[in-house]
């Protein structure tokens, strides 16, 4: 028995654009059904199955609620496995990455919380644009390489967004 499709667990068709509020609501409903505590008096086998179902549900939810992880997953179930670590041959984006990192470093050095807020808005807009671009091409076989490039960019911006949140917390203290 293979692992069920993450989308199928939530009664969804594979697609990139998801209503994350509905996904969260459905997750909570399903989590209550398979929570291991509900099987405390069940047999050891039933407890193990409940634990496995709960873990699979958690993994599926974490994957689907994250745009970069959802993008990678969609490519994988479409037969386009993307290695985790690969050299990026995208000079324009590499230059953009360097510029963003330098700007973030300057904001940190200057302890510029307002500047960080502006940077965060620009980053969010860039993420939204990548999400739209990916949504338009992920299921077009001729555009799978483009979709992979976009997914890698999404991963970078997601990591950068985490760094921005951490910087905000440090500057806010």
From Swiss-Prot:
Organism classification: Bacteria, Pseudomonadati, Pseudomonadota, Gammaproteobacteria, Pseudomonadales
Keyword presence, Chaperone: yes
GO BP terms, alphabetized: [2Fe-2S] cluster assembly; protein complex oligomerization; protein folding
Protein name: Co-chaperone protein HscB homolog
Gene (UniProt): hscB
NCBIfam families linked to this entry: hscB, PRK00294.1
GO molecular function terms noted in the UniProt entry: ATPase activator activity; protein-folding chaperone binding
Assembly: Interacts with HscA and stimulates its ATPase activity.
Function: Co-chaperone involved in the maturation of iron-sulfur cluster-containing proteins. Seems to help targeting proteins to be folded toward HscA.
UniProt keywords, alphabetically: Chaperone
J domain ranges (all copies): 5-77
GO CC terms, sorted: iron-sulfur cluster transfer complex
UniProt cross-references to Pfam families, sorted A to Z: DnaJ, HSCB_C
Family: Belongs to the HscB family.
InterPro entries noted in UniProt: DnaJ_domain, HscB, HscB_C_sf, HscB_oligo_C, J_dom_sf
């Amino acid at each position: 028995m293979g692992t069920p499709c993450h989308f199928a667990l939530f009664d969804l068709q594979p697609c990139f654009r998801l209503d994350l509020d509905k996904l969260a609501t459905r997750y909570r409903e399903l989590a209550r059904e398979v929570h291991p505590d509900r099987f405390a008096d069940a047999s050891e086998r039933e407890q193990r199955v409940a634990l496995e179902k709960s873990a699979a549900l958690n993994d599926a939810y974490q994957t689907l609620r994250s745009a970069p992880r959802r993008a990678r997953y969609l490519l994988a179930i479409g037969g386009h496995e993307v290695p985790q670590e690969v050299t990026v041959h995208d000079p324009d984006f590499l230059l953009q990455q360097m510029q963003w990192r330098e700007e973030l470093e300057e904001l940190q050095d200057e302890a510029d919380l307002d500047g960080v807020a502006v940077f965060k808005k620009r980053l969010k807009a860039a993420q939204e644009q990548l999400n739209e671009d990916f949504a338009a091409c992920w299921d077009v076989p001729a555009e799978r390489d483009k979709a992979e490039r976009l997914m890698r960019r999404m991963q970078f911006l997601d990591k950068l967004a985490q760094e921005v949140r951490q910087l905000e917390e440090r500057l806010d203290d």
